[in-house]
Amino acid sequence: MAKDIYKTFKRSVSGIVGGNNINGEGSSSPSTSAPQVKYRGGTGRTWIHPPDYLINGHVEYVARFLGCVETPKANGSDVAREAIHAIRFQRDLKRSEQTRETAKLQKVEIRISIDNVIIADIKTKAPMYTFPLGRISFCADDKDDKRMFSFIARAEGASGKPSCYAFTSEKLAEDITLTIGEAFDLAYKRFLDKNRTSLENQKQIYILKKKIVELETENQVLIERLAEALRANSKADYENTGPPIYPGLGPPALPLSPMPQGPPPNIPPSSIYSMPRANDLPPTEMAPTLPQISTSSNGASPSVSPASTSPSGPAPSIPPPRPPALAPPPPVAPRRNPVVSPKNSTAGLLDGLELGSAEPAKKAPSNIFDDSFDPRAGEKKSTAAEYNPFGADFLSGIQNGKEAPPSASAELLASEAIARLPKPESSSVPPKKTAAEYDAMINEVEKKLAAMSSGSFEFGQLQTGDLGGIEGESDYGTPSDRLNPKMMNLKQ
């Protein structure tokens, strides 16, 4: 009597929907007696939970874990039925070795969300298995026995093998199957919302690439036609005028004005701009000689004035003679290293002088215009084998004259620049796609967009089935391919 009251109370409490767990996520355990609210899904299916429960939280179900076993296939009702038979057979073999407490099935929580399905221990709340929805390929419940429920999930890794996980619950197997299907529908809708925009952008990229290929093909055709026309024109010119003197170019044009042979005719020969010629005659006018000035015996010069005075006034002065018209000497190029007299040179006075040094004085070079002079010749310099534009060559070291190592940002810039350099052509480089190939790619994207619009996209479809009336636990059948002598402790 007390047991029946406990079951009735448990069923009434399990009808509370939308409670909050410790982590603040929504969870629900639908009742088997209360009528359930139906929600229409995006794929035409009927949902039993509000979408927010699975999107923002999760839905929890309490069940007992029967066990798991590997399966040869990832889907199929026959595969799940055979796996459940194998699990029950293994449990019955171990029942004789177990006590009454250990023989009980483990009680677990099944947490279903839009991201994954988690199997956790009901006492410790520690997750036992975590299955992303993408790894679950098949889900089935028994239409006759409402307690049996199983799903097939693939193990982690690319080469993970599928395994069947079986559970028993208090007439909630169908609800668990519908909840997992609802999670798949919502994940599928989220996938469409995220990928529809990317597919449309990919379609536009393919259209632009196709246009580029068409323009490049047209440009190549025009280049070939132009080269053919130029070859035809050059052939016609060769037949008419003969081979050209300058290959590829026409003869140069002659200048219209003649080249001048001398200075302009309107400049007189006595001008300072005229240069002496070989046939010029020497000047006929010579400079007058001046009278010698004699000195007296006492050393005083006689009073000789250039102009004598008279009572009537000063005598007129004789105008100075006009200098002869002499041509200037030819220009002389300046010397690069003029010779400096050692007597009047400051360099000679400071020769061999070195201030503030205890070492013997070294003779300084006498040529102050020597280009090889280096004032930093005594300093220690760092020599680099090759200049690295992305390295830290511009940062000189402060210890022992060593170079500072390149920074991480400089190495990153160098790697990015090297990656952007055009790679040499090799056999591994794929050839360029043609316009027909881009047409095929555009058609594939359009098919995916059409499938998204109609809801027939193949991604995220969960296959469901019926276990077909699993026999009772006492009337199980022996699986055909699950007999293991080592596990059964039997002699071969």
From Swiss-Prot:
Residues 373-383 have a biased composition (Basic and acidic residues). Residues 55-215 form the PID domain. Disulfide bonds: none annotated. Residues 19-29, 300-312 have a biased composition (Low complexity). It is found in: Cytoplasm. One of its GO terms (molecular function) is clathrin adaptor activity. InterPro entries: Adapter_Engulfment-Domain, PH-like_dom_sf, PTB/PI_dom. Residues 19-38, 241-385, 464-492 are annotated as: Disordered. The keyword Nucleus does not apply. One of its GO terms (biological process) is engulfment of apoptotic cell. GO terms for cellular component: cytoplasmic side of plasma membrane; phagocytic vesicle. Belongs to the ced-6 family. Homodimer. Interacts with ced-1. Interacts with E3 ubiquitin-protein ligase trim-21. PANTHER family: GULP PTB DOMAIN CONTAINING ENGULFMENT ADAPTOR 1, PHOSPHOTYROSINE INTERACTION DOMAIN-CONTAINING FAMILY MEMBER. This is Cell death protein 6. It comes from Caenorhabditis elegans.
